[in-house]
């Protein structure tokens, strides 16, 4: 048994949960996995974990709810396919009950990676032949993976026709190119470390898309600087170059990924970060317009709520002392499903505001409010390079507010305002 198993206590006699690719991931390089309908998980990065543990109360409504930590290892099923399986950590009794997540349990009996030798001896081939064949297969898989990633870089904008039967999530299960890329890369990394380690900590976070039938997701890389204080000279230079060659340097924000439903053609459009880096300021504005356009008309009813939330977030961040959200993203999410039009008069709008306040008071910052045509979510994600004076081990302590991030928010507010005014809103 490897040292990794001894150093991480896992609850005994607990069924593991099969982790699946999160099909609505449109950006980032960290693998995000589906734990259950309302919960996602991603590899634990100490700095990000510390951020969620010490999160200021007024920022909670602008971030996913943090739900705890699980242990993840990869195992083989009876067909020798590698799967990622989550187990509860000993003594961790967070808001997520693993035993009840039957919808995500493996459909086939799983063989533990540590029992692989026993599995090999049951085959007709000798161990040497099996190892030789296994290495050959792995080499071919690795080469195929590299080819697919190169194709993904070149195919910066993709379209996928959505069937009327079945949910969008089930249809995207084996399609979303960015989600599959991140999932395969995570498996590859864990396989390469198998001899030394097969147990990892992952954090559990709220699935922000679970309330939407056809989630439209915009991932924006925020700020004029992306590298953390601990980045190597090479990494810092690379991140500085990316900022200088994109809209990050000019307006403090760039497109990192997009998934939007176009009702006119019944297609989902995907845009990846490679395309986002190439956009000019005008191109960024056009991409934002495209995100709020369903192929038939501009979803003008979304613009007001988005502006309200962006303005509120900006005010919150202006009060945060010494925080720097380097390489953090901002998600904008709405439902691409067409709903019957509802015209709100001033009294109805006041009633809506009142219902939101009462929902917050009764159920806390993460209350799920009734959805409608204008329901839209704005959340900050990805805090692996965030720093603050609360993090005692940081060599650099910043003063004041994160001006680069706030500059990006103001640019976003200005551009959405322009789109709204030009469309006659």
Swiss-Prot record:
Pathway, per record: Phospholipid metabolism; phosphatidylinositol metabolism
A matching Pfam family: IPK
Catalytic activity: 1D-myo-inositol hexakisphosphate + ATP = 5-diphospho-1D-myo-inositol 1,2,3,4,6-pentakisphosphate + ADP
Any one Gene Ontology cellular component term annotated for this protein: cytoplasm
Record-listed E.C. numbers: 2.7.4.-
Gene3D superfamilies: Inositol polyphosphate kinase
Domain of life: Eukaryota
Locations listed in the record: Nucleus
Entry keywords, A to Z: ATP-binding, Kinase, Lipid metabolism, Nucleotide-binding, Nucleus, Phospholipid metabolism, Transferase
Keyword Transferase in annotation: yes
Tissues in which the UniProt entry reports expression: Highly expressed in small intestine.
GO annotation (BP), single: protein stabilization
Binding residue positions for ATP: 206-208, 219, 382
Enzyme kind, highest EC tier: transferase
InterPro entries xref list: IPK, IPK_sf
UniProt-recorded Gene Ontology molecular function terms: ATP binding; flavonoid binding; inositol hexakisphosphate 5-kinase activity; inositol hexakisphosphate kinase activity
Binding site for substrate: 215-223, 235-242, 385
Function noted in UniProt: Converts inositol hexakisphosphate (InsP6) to diphosphoinositol pentakisphosphate (InsP7/PP-InsP5).
Protein family per UniProt: Belongs to the inositol phosphokinase (IPK) family.
Name of the protein this chain belongs to: Inositol hexakisphosphate kinase 2
Organism this protein belongs to: Rattus norvegicus
């Amino acid at each position: 048994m490897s040292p990794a198993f001894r150093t991480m206590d896992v609850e005994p006699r607990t069924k593991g949960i099969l982790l699946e690719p999160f099909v609505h991931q449109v950006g980032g390089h960290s693998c995000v996995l589906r734990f259950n309908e309302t919960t996602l998980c991603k590899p634990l990065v100490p700095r990000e974990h510390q951020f969620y543990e010490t999160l200021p109360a007024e920022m909670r409504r602008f971030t996913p709810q943090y739900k705890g930590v699980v242990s993840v290892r990869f195992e083989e099923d009876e067909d020798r396919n590698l799967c990622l399986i989550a187990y509860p950590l000993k003594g961790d009794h967070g808001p997520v009950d693993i035993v009840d997540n039957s919808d995500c349990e493996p459909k086939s009996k799983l063989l533990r990676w540590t029992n692989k030798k026993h599995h090999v001896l049951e085959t007709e081939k000798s161990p040497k032949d099996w190892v030789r064949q296994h290495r050959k297969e792995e080499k071919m898989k690795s080469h195929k993976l590299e080819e697919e990633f190169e194709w993904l870089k070149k195919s910066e904008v993709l379209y996928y026709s959505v069937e009327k039967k079945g949910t969008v999530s089930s249809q995207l299960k084996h399609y979303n190119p960015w989600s599959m890329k991140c999932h395969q890369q995570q498996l590859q990394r864990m396989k390469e470390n198998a001899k030394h380690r097969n147990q990892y900590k992952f954090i559990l976070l709220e699935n922000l898309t679970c309330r939407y039938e056809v989630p439209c997701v915009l991932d924006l890389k925020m700020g004029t600087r992306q590298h953390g204080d601990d980045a190597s000279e090479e990494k810092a230079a690379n991140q500085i170059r990316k900022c200088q060659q994109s809209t990050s340097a000019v307006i403090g924000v760039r497109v990192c990924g997009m998934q939007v439903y176009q009702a006119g053609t019944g297609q989902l459009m995907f845009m990846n970060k490679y395309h986002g880096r190439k956009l000019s300021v005008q191109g960024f504005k056009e991409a934002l317009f495209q995100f709020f356009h369903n192929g038939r008309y501009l979803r003008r009813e979304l613009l007001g709520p988005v502006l309200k939330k962006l303005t509120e977030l900006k005010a919150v961040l202006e009060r945060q002392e010494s925080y720097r959200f380097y390489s953090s993203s901002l998600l904008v999410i709405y439902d691409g499903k067409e709903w019957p039009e509802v015209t709100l008069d001033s009294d109805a709008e006041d009633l809506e505001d009142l219902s939101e306040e009462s929902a917050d008071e009764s159920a806390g910052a993460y209350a799920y409010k009734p959805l409608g045509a204008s329901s839209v979510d704005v959340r900050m994600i990805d805090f692996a390079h965030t720093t603050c004076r609360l993090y005692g081990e940081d060599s650099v302590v910043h003063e004041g507010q994160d001006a680069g991030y706030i500059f990006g928010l103001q640019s976003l507010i200005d551009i959405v305002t322009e789109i709204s005014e030009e469309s006659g809103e």
